[in-house]
UniProtKB/Swiss-Prot annotation:
Any Pfam family: Aminotran_3
Catalyzed reaction equations: L-2-aminoadipate + 2-oxoglutarate = 2-oxoadipate + L-glutamate; 5-aminopentanoate + 2-oxoglutarate = 5-oxopentanoate + L-glutamate
PROSITE patterns: AA_TRANSFER_CLASS_3 (PS00600)
Gene3D superfamilies, per database record: Aspartate Aminotransferase, domain 1, Type I PLP-dependent aspartate aminotransferase-like (Major domain)
Official protein name in the record: 2-aminoadipate transaminase
Entry annotated with the keyword Transferase: yes
Positions bearing N6-(pyridoxal phosphate)lysine: 259
Cofactors that this protein relies on: pyridoxal 5'-phosphate
Residues that, per the record, bind pyridoxal 5'-phosphate: 102-103, 233, 288
Length: 416
């Protein structure tokens, strides 16, 4: 693979060149087939080249390929926002805007939060990931490699421990850390918003403690602080339902969307309480390419397939296959390096750990390389890159899913 014209600051996980894909399978330019457990890093919940999405893209490309919504509205943008207002399960009137990416959605949410509250400080969480733009870098709960050598970042942003059964941080410990933050470093009246993922993606598929989310919601409601929930990776069926936040027992004030919203086309959104989305002056939100007609058409075709029944069926099938395999591997002692199973629904991660519980990223790397040689693509996550995240399309055929898990099992067995 010739990379001479590619920035060497871009890290490439798999040194192959892809040619085409179908549902949960891709082929490289040499004709080698791979089962895809990466899914474009969570973008392809409905699979590669989903027929309905492709048809929608082709049809829209013959009608209108671009028009800046700020200059003149177009039908696909309007239709998609109407669909999203019905698809997002909240109790309040919802409004929003479309963006080109998840990071851009996060950036705009920060603007809205500051504009609506008149406050500046944002509180994020250890292990979180919200994008690669300058402002979203500061939200990320990890320095290397994202924040290295880029200098001062927009703020102020503060970080708290992420309470989860997967991190070992309890609700009580996180609340104590929050109390300390407000007594030592930051005046609570300066806080505009908290931002978090209900299930951390880059962090290793770690699920937030619902008790903490509910305590935080009460805390914010009493003080006029907003909650921004990032469902960029966990949304659109990944956890077996439309979004992951309902399992927390709270509603967000602002919600970030992207990845599987549009079947592989670049699109994001920030949606939330209608009064918040009107807090900035006219012209305060927008973008030349935001809500491109072709991306909107792809999103409409995607949402049409994401019925509650479909999402539950797809998610349960994949969850059962992964969990049953994992339990069998642990019970049989397949490999001493198999640690915890993280995540929710079909959003699952497998931790690699040494006997003393410390991360084992080198062993994960060996499994990824061996799996690729056998025709399975995997993706690492976690602070130490020691958790494999399983992101196969939800629409993967049962036999292809089992074939992929068979390959993973063979590679795990070789670690012995």
């Amino acid at each position: 693979m010739n990379q001479e014209s590619i920035s060497q600051s871009i890290a490439i996980v798999h040194p192959i060149t892809l040619s085409h894909g179908r549902n949960a399978e891709v082929w490289d330019t040499d004709g080698k087939r791979y089962i895809d457990f990466v899914g474009g890093i969570g973008v392809l919940n409905l699979g590669h080249c989903n027929p309905a999405v492709v048809e929608a893209i082709q049809a829209q490309a013959t009608r209108l390929t671009h028009y800046a919504f700020n200059a003149a509205p177009h039908g696909p943008y309007l239709a998609l926002m109407e669909q999203l207002s019905q698809f997002v399960p909240v109790s309040y009137p919802l409004a929003g805007m479309l963006t080109n990416s998840g990071a851009e959605a996060a950036e705009n949410a920060l603007k809205v939060a500051r504009g609506a509250t008149g406050k500046r400080a944002i509180i994020a969480f250890d292990g979180g990931f919200h994008g690669r733009t300058l402002a979203t870098l500061n939200l990320n709960g990890k320095v290397a490699p994202y924040k290295q050598r880029v200098g001062e970042l927009p703020g102020p942003v503060y970080h708290l421990p992420y309470p989860s059964a997967d991190t070992g941080v309890t609700c009580e410990q996180a609340l104590k850390a929050m109390d300390r933050l407000f007594s030592v470093e930051l005046a609570v009246e300066d806080v505009a918003a908290f931002i978090f993922e209900p299930v951390q993606g880059e962090g290793g598929f770690l699920a937030l403690d619902p008790a903490f989310a509910q305590a935080l919601r009460r805390f914010c409601d009493e003080r006029g602080i907003l909650i921004i929930i990032d469902e960029i990776q966990s949304g659109f069926g990944r956890t077996g339902q439309r979004f992951a936040f309902p399992r927390l027992g709270i509603e967000p004030d602002l919600l970030l969307l992207a990845k599987s919203i549009a079947g592989g086309m670049p699109l994001g959104a920030v949606v939330g309480r209608k009064e918040l989305m009107a807090a900035l002056p006219k012209g305060g939100l927008g973008g030349t390419y935001s809500g491109n007609p072709i991306s909107c058409a792809a999103a409409l075709a995607s949402l049409a397939q994401m019925t509650d029944e479909n999402l539950a069926t797809w998610g349960e099938r994949q969850e059962q296959a992964i969990v049953s395999r994992y339990e069998r591997w642990k019970a049989s002692g397949l490999s001493p390096y198999i640690g915890r199973l993280t995540g929710v629904g079909a959003m699952r991660g497998i931790e690699f750990a040494n006997a003393d519980g410390s991360p084992a990223p080198a062993q994960l790397a060996k499994v990824m390389e061996a799996a690729r040689a056998r025709g399975l693509l995997l993706m690492p996550s976690g602070k130490a890159r020691h958790i494999i995240r399983l992101l196969a399309p939800l629409t993967i055929e049962a036999e292809v899913l089992e074939e992929g898990l068979d390959i993973l099992e063979q590679c795990l067995a070789e670690l012995n």
